[in-house]
């Protein structure tokens, strides 16, 4: 899951700061999601899925269909 959110961000040519801003959080906090240091709350997963126009199932690795 953590690799997928990083890959989606990089594919969109976005910085961690930009995604963190969308989520209303600090870059440091968001970075900890990408590295797996912190678990990603459900509401953040939903927001990321909407942001990247994908499903929560894709982010969680339950499907490979974006």
Tell me the role of every PLM-derived stretch:
Residues 4, 15, 41-44, 55:
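Residues that mark the N-terminal boundary/hinge immediately upstream of a DNA-recognition element
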Residues 17, 28, 57:
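Key DNA-contact positions within bacterial/archaeal DNA-binding proteins
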Residues 24, 43-58:
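DNA major-groove recognition helix of helix-turn-helix/homeodomain DNA-binding modules
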Residues 24-39:
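Recognition helix of helix-turn-helix/homeodomain-like DNA-binding domains
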